[in-house]
Amino acid sequence: MFIMSSISHAQLGWNDAGTPVSDQFDDVYFSNVNGLAETRYVFLEQNHLPQRWHNDDQRRFVIAETGFGTGLNFLAVWQAFVAFREANPDAKLKELHFISFEKYPLSKSDLIQAHQAWPELAQFAQKLHKHYPLAIPECQRIVLDDGLITLDLWFGDIKDCLPKVATQEQGLVDAWFLDGFAPSKNPEMWNQGLFAGMAKLAKHGCTCATFTSAGFVRRGLIDAGFAMKKVKGFGTKREMIAGSLSEKVPYTNIAPEFRFEATHGLQEVAIIGGGIASATLATTLARRGVAVTLYCADEKPAQGASGNRQGAVYPLLSGDHNAVSRVFAPAFLFARQWIEQAAEQINFDHDWCGVTQLMWDEKATDKLKSMLEGDFPTQLVRGLSAEQTNQQVGVPVDKASVHYPLGGWLCPAELTQGLIHLLAQQGKLTAHYQTPIDELTWQPETQLWQLRSGDTLMSHQCVVIASGHQFDSLSQTAELPLGKVKGQVSHIPTTETLSKINSVLCYDGYMTPVSQQNGYHCIGASYDRQHLDATFDPQAQRENAQKLIHCLPEQTWPLEVDVGGNQSRQGVRCVSRDHLPFVGNVGEFSKITEQYRDLAQQQEAEPIALYPQLYALVGLGSRGLSSAPLMAELLASQMCGDPMPLGVDLLEQLHPSRMWVRKLRKGKALTQKV
């Protein structure tokens, strides 16, 4: 079992100058005199910012920081980068990525109070407040200013978090801000392990600056490979130290059997699909300046599993913090942020009404009570008594439950179609409908993929397969061990009683509150592995209603659910056995079978065989609305060579070749789907 410590918020006091003081470390968060000026001098000026940005030929500049604290350093850099971009709109450098580690994050209320000291940063601080995440362990990604700024907040002890940051051999970080409380106040952080970890993540030429001039810090950084020197300190402080990495020693923490590759100089991509995976990925790539061509087999987007009227948005959590839970907790928070940002640009039916899971039988009760033992923040999930559940749901259920206050529902069809149409209007996406891709062929001489649809041939630098249950129509992904499950969702008219339901209700099925747009609820959904067509199933229609009656036999209002109108929608889900999506480079099945035939005996695996510039985003299952935005962000980060939004061990759990590798490690042959 993975052991994960819950995150404690910082305990603060405020001194006479109005400066926050840590109770844990008995130290101020920033200078009593002029904290913002000190930040600019110590961290921007000594890292030669913004001067370096003018000559940088990268698309994205990466800063890493020890100790997020009040976010002052981040806000100051954000302000400086916006000014740089406004003054230099044609500069090659387009985006800023800020990675920060924090063991004791401030609560949102303390963060807001601390930011009152800097009114000139208010416009940036308010955007941060809006999306400041819950204190969930590991990485929480926030995308700001439509992708101009990306903030990765790693919550937890830096000695645990730093090794989880996925790092390719060339490194990741352009500048280090070595901040945090004074070494004398926080000796656990300031050690050789930290300095060595900084060097491992650093790129060639990475700079470093810190407010302290402590000799052991300077010597430790030198031992780690940085060339450090003393410089004039800020204000009355005599000295501080700054420097740069002398020589980059290649380092990676990515296992060869789970390696992934970026597409160097990515300019354009073909996405095969048309559902929520395609729409979120297209949006995320377009933010990075990548031109998108969409090939959709249907006459318009969202005709498959993403075409429902109402879909629930809530996380899949586990009390033992297994891989699924560690993916879905940050994925849900990112989805919530992402959906709110999308709602500022397009219209789609949605309601953050909360989601309530009923303890309707002994098995469900045991499972949900076990989940609550995971010590999650109550803003994410909390247990409710039967009486509290009745009040929360709006109709009598007389069952205890767990409630997700930040959850809700949205119309996936409207979201998917709205995103794709918006990108097309902006000239960032070209869509080809009724264009199924029959064949993919890699052209070594041009380093391009050739796509065939009927008699028509197209060429693209990079291809992503995001076609849901149709993943096996192409030879490159035909062997992926994914399943297909048909689902039928029933549309039922509301009644006076049913209209009182004000939370998504989950039991052995689910029921949504009424949509104010059409006066209907959604109830479902069936699971059928035998019949994978899109035809209406009268038995599934009856069973959708019967599940609610079965789970709440003492209540009369479920009898008002009328499925007799036979209104419904059918789709086929693409599912994985371990409940996690398949995200990343597509492995070359035949070569992997050969190269890893004796993997169980190999001391160190050779790098896994991957198709060049070919990726997959499939297997989103029943929780695609909660996972798709972060999975798209993860894949875009991988394709573009950006920092990853999840720990390196979780990337292994999402790798499209993971099940093949697991089987081969056990000495079993890959003769058929795993």
Curated annotation (Swiss-Prot):
Source superkingdom: Bacteria
Region called tRNA (mnm(5)s(2)U34)-methyltransferase, residue ranges: 1-246
Keyword hit for Methyltransferase: yes
Cofactor list: FAD
Gene that this polypeptide is encoded by: mnmC
Keyword terms: Cytoplasm, FAD, Flavoprotein, Methyltransferase, Multifunctional enzyme, Oxidoreductase, S-adenosyl-L-methionine, Transferase, tRNA processing
Endpoints of the signal sequence: none
Family assignment from sequence similarity: In the N-terminal section; belongs to the methyltransferase superfamily. tRNA (mnm(5)s(2)U34)-methyltransferase family. In the C-terminal section; belongs to the DAO family.
Region of interest (FAD-dependent cmnm(5)s(2)U34 oxidoreductase), ranges: 272-674
EC number of the protein: 2.1.1.61, 1.5.-.-
Primary location: cytoplasm
Record-linked PANTHER family: SARCOSINE DEHYDROGENASE-RELATED (PTHR13847), TRNA 5-METHYLAMINOMETHYL-2-THIOURIDINE BIOSYNTHESIS BIFUNCTIONAL PROTEIN MNMC (PTHR13847:SF283)
Catalytic activity: 5-aminomethyl-2-thiouridine(34) in tRNA + S-adenosyl-L-methionine = 5-methylaminomethyl-2-thiouridine(34) in tRNA + S-adenosyl-L-homocysteine + H(+)
Lineage: Bacteria, Pseudomonadati, Pseudomonadota, Gammaproteobacteria, Vibrionales
The UniProt record lists the keyword Nucleotide-binding: no
GO-annotated cellular components: cytoplasm
A GO biological process held by the record: tRNA wobble uridine modification
Protein name per Swiss-Prot or TrEMBL: tRNA 5-methylaminomethyl-2-thiouridine biosynthesis bifunctional protein MnmC
Protein task: Catalyzes the last two steps in the biosynthesis of 5-methylaminomethyl-2-thiouridine (mnm(5)s(2)U) at the wobble position (U34) in tRNA. Catalyzes the FAD-dependent demodification of cmnm(5)s(2)U34 to nm(5)s(2)U34, followed by the transfer of a methyl group from S-adenosyl-L-methionine to nm(5)s(2)U34, to form mnm(5)s(2)U34.
Cross-referenced InterPro entries: FAD-dep_OxRdtase, FAD/NAD-bd_sf, MnmC-like_methylTransf, SAM-dependent_MTases_sf, tRNA_MAMT_biosynth_bifunc_MnmC, tRNA_MNMC2, tRNA_S-uridine_synth_MnmC_C
Entries under Pfam families matching the protein: DAO, Methyltransf_30
SUPFAM superfamilies, per database record: FAD/NAD(P)-binding domain
Gene Ontology molecular-function annotations: flavin adenine dinucleotide binding; oxidoreductase activity, acting on the CH-NH group of donors; tRNA (5-methylaminomethyl-2-thiouridylate)(34)-methyltransferase activity
Localization per record: Cytoplasm
